[in-house]
Amino acid sequence: MTCGVLFGTISETALSDAIPGSCTIFTASYGNTVLFGNNEDYTNPKTYYWVHPSSDENYGGVYVGFDNFNLQGGINEKGLSFDANALPKARLNPHPELPAPPSEWVVETIMKKAATVEEAIDIAGRYKRDNWGIPFKYQIILADATGDAVVISAGPDGELAFTRKKQGDGYLVSTNFNRANPENAYSYPCWRYNRAVEMLKKIEDENDLTVDYFKSILDSVHGEGASNNTLYSNIFDMRNGIIYLYHWHQYDEVVKLNVAEQIERGFWCQRIADLFSQQTNDKALAEYLGYQGKMIIARKNLAWVWMILVAFSLVVLIWNLARGAQVSWRVRLVWVLVVVLFGPFGLMGYYLSYRQRQRSAAHESALESQGASF
């Protein structure tokens, strides 16, 4: 399959649009089990997975995302995993004194070069911040096969901030508020964050930390709707190199991918939907078309409401002009055109202009009266 720009460098424009909406990402480690879970919430149904093979210089990896093939999440051959949350833009100090970064997104460099969270943090701070994206509108969560994890975001001071998972058994969660600066948020407090934490707290030992339990967390925080929908979910078993994929918040069918086997295939990409049964795809399509139909109806209703408002505004304007407003026909035609284009907002502009004329006329009349009295 041809994957377009899959193996090219990432532009600033692509990077600024790369991180989708209300994703919920979490990782946990207990004993010898380390898992990483993600719900990809967005509007683009064209989802893919693809493979970067290993080389003498780079680790191979399996990645997930959309048809622009910007990395949204993934796992490399060493078990290092990542995903990202969208945030409002934040300031990031450029550090021009540092070496120039590679001509790719910093996370892609990390996934090629790092095996652990410690190595990822070292790479993150090594270069100028050019390849983080301008403006900086996201945070990333990274976890490795040892159980270490970190959320990297912009701190209040404009420096990279590293929110670490506690050492040993435990968990780390990332949604759409900045873990180092909660004021930088799309939603805070975040119900998805609170729900995920509530469920992760119930894990007491390694026997509780299972793929099925992670799946239940993903299900409990998934989204449905025309504006933001859980398009796919993934669970990475980092110790065993296994990917569990779910399509369109349907958690009753799972596809398992072996990371090592996928990397051996070389450069490769495939639609996520093509991995699943016709029944699962039919359900997803029916839901998608249902949302699209509702959006079309809503747009039509909005168009009718707007036309009614424009017509009403035009009637009010013509009535006012006919009452004897002292303006030329040319000015009247201009106001008619303004109201046709801008509806009630144009009418509001007319009234503001009319009031201004009245005030000017009253002021001139007062001055004339004062002059006559002298």
Where are these predicted regions, by residue range?
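Selective detector of the "anchor" transmembrane alpha-helix that sits immediately C-terminal
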Residues: 301-319
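C-terminal, well-structured catalytic/ligand-binding subdomain of enzymes
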Residues: 14-22, 26-112, 136, 143-290
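Bacterial N-terminal signal peptides
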Residues: 1-7
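Amphipathic, cytosolic membrane-interfacial segments at TM-TM junctions
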Residues: 318-338, 362-363
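Membrane-interface alpha-helices
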Residues: 325, 349-374
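Intrinsically disordered, low-complexity linker/loop segments enriched in Gly/Pro
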Residues: 104-122, 126-132
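Hydrophobic, aromatic-rich membrane-embedded alpha-helical segments
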Residues: 333-356
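Individual transmembrane alpha-helix segments
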Residues: 291-305
